[in-house]
């Protein structure tokens, strides 16, 4: 920070205040995590200076011999993590990765089967406001109204009816194990390709705690942050037969120069994920999520689908205590707990209001929170949300958050 402080005090102050916010708040946004100092150092390195259009050994610029090394290592480590035949580590984001797959697998206006956003899907899985919904004819599948789990019979029925060219599996707010084998069987039945967006569960997959979609899917996309605990970015894993098409669609198709400093940080994160303690970490992520869900149930909250198999807990706050997701998010933020409002299946509220909140355990687990800590987190959440207009109770919740975060300091 010393260089930034000398050059730009306003930015330095904003960064410092953001660090203090992260350190003093309990981070429960399911898509966020805390990267290691090594990942941050790689991302802030001199590699940010280097242009390297093309791929290792096939660049349009000179002086790429060392970024060739870092990018090749990132590719090899990703292959080792997931057992993929081919990996492209250049996508700037998960959305860019998804766009590239769509451009390879589809023509404009082709029919695609994707998960309904309000049931747990993602914007890039066919939301009308997103490029995916504008360029392609997405047909939505969802969860069963009673179980709130993916209804595979409905997926099959829709596939047989609409004959999609591509089926997209994966979600941004779904707390149960996804059966990729079933998706593959359905795709094969209608002669469709299968794409899996594993952005939220990639870390669990790498640790062997969730079925690996690489075995079944033609294309697998992911972000490199979230549970994978790397820098913000994207990645595509695919069969060897799609290597050429995927690579030329990323560059020169939809991107120019790759962010080699970010790719180096991806390589570092993948190296960390190959270590034994990464599996231990992911096991704790899942344990903590299960404890959080159970503790909230004991406090009287309804958990979507009745629990969780992964890192994520979806809470029906409107149905439980009458607060909207927006109100719950704001109340928790006021006491130092960060989460996000989220639609729940069959939600009657607008997307900016919602009936639910989405909670995740990866970030707090990274800083050391265990089951006991998450039992306390659930009690604080309950105290705050049930007393959202009581300043005395909210102050008590705030003090309990401060005590908990002090026990598990960030970057110490």
UniProtKB/Swiss-Prot annotation:
Q: Does the keyword Cytoplasm apply?
A: yes
- Its GO biological process terms? glycine biosynthetic process from serine; tetrahydrofolate interconversion
Annotated Gene Ontology cellular component terms: cytosol
Residues at the site labelled Plays an important role in substrate specificity: 225
Listed EC numbers: 2.1.2.1
**What keywords does the record list, in alphabetical order?**
Amino-acid biosynthesis, Cytoplasm, One-carbon metabolism, Pyridoxal phosphate, Transferase
Compartments, as annotated in UniProt? Cytoplasm
According to UniProt, this protein's pathway is: One-carbon metabolism; tetrahydrofolate interconversion; Amino-acid biosynthesis; glycine biosynthesis; glycine from L-serine: step 1/1
Query: Known InterPro entries for this protein?
Result: PyrdxlP-dep_Trfase, PyrdxlP-dep_Trfase_major, PyrdxlP-dep_Trfase_small, Ser_HO-MeTrfase, Ser_HO-MeTrfase-like, Ser_HO-MeTrfase_PLP_BS, SHMT-like_dom
The GO terms describing molecular function are: glycine hydroxymethyltransferase activity; pyridoxal phosphate binding
Residues the record lists as N6-(pyridoxal phosphate)lysine modifications: 226
Q: Which residues bind (6S)-5,6,7,8-tetrahydrofolate?
A: 117, 121-123
Q: Which cofactor does it need?
A: pyridoxal 5'-phosphate
Listed under catalytic activity are: (6R)-5,10-methylene-5,6,7,8-tetrahydrofolate + glycine + H2O = (6S)-5,6,7,8-tetrahydrofolate + L-serine
The record's section on NCBIfam families has: PRK00011.1
Function, in words = Catalyzes the reversible interconversion of serine and glycine with tetrahydrofolate (THF) serving as the one-carbon carrier. This reaction serves as the major source of one-carbon groups required for the biosynthesis of purines, thymidylate, methionine, and other important biomolecules. Also exhibits THF-independent aldolase activity toward beta-hydroxyamino acids, producing glycine and aldehydes, via a retro-aldol mechanism.
How this chain assembles, per its entry, is: Homodimer.
Which family, according to the similarity comment? Answer: Belongs to the SHMT family.
This chain's protein is named Serine hydroxymethyltransferase
Task: Record the organism.
Answer: Staphylococcus aureus (strain USA300 / TCH1516)
């Amino acid at each position: 920070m010393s260089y930034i402080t000398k050059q730009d005090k306003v930015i330095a102050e904003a960064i410092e205040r953001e660090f203090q916010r992260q350190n003093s708040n309990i981070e429960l946004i399911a898509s966020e995590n805390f990267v290691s100092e090594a990942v941050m150092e790689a991302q802030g390195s001199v590699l940010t200076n280097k242009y390297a259009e093309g791929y290792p050994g096939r660049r349009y610029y000179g002086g790429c011999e060392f970024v060739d090394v870092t990018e090749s290592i990132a590719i090899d480590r990703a292959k080792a993590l997931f057992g993929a035949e081919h990996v492209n580590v250049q996508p700037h984001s998960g959305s860019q990765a998804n766009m590239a797959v769509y451009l390879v697998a589809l023509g404009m206006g082709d029919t695609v089967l994707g998960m309904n956003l309000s049931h747990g899907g993602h914007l890039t899985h066919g939301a009308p406001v997103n490029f995916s919904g504008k360029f392609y004819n997405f047909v939505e599948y969802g969860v069963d109204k009673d179980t709130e789990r993916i209804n595979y019979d409905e997926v099959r029925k829709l596939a047989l009816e609409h004959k999609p060219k591509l089926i997209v599996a994966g979600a941004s707010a779904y707390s149960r194990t996804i059966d990729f084998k079933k998706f593959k069987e359905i795709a094969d039945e209608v002669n469709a390709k299968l794409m899996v967006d594993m952005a939220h569960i990639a870390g669990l997959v790498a640790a062997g705690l969730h079925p690996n979609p690489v075995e079944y899917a033609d294309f697998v996309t992911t972000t490199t942050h979230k549970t994978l605990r790397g820098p913000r970015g994207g990645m595509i894993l695919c069969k060897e037969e799609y290597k050429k098409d995927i690579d030329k669609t990323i560059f020169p198709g939809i991107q120019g120069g790759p962010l080699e400093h970010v790719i180096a940080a991806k390589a570092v994160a993948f190296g960390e994920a190959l270590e034994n303690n990464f599996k231990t970490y992911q096991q704790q992520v899942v344990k903590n999520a299960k404890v959080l869900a159970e503790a909230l149930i004991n406090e009287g909250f309804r958990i979507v689908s009745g629990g969780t198999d992964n890192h994520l807990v979806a809470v029906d706050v409107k149905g439980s205590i009458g607060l909207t997701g927006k109100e719950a998010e704001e109340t928790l933020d006021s006491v130092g707990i960060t989460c996000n409002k989220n639609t729940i299946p069959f939600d009657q509220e607008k997307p900016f209001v919602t009936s639910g909140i989405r909670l995740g355990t990866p970030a707090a687990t990274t800083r050391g929170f265990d089951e006991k800590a998450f039992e306390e987190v659930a009690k604080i959440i309950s105290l705050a949300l049930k007393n959202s207009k009581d300043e005395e109770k909210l102050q008590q919740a705030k003090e309990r958050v401060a005590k908990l975060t002090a026990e598990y300091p960030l970057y110490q």
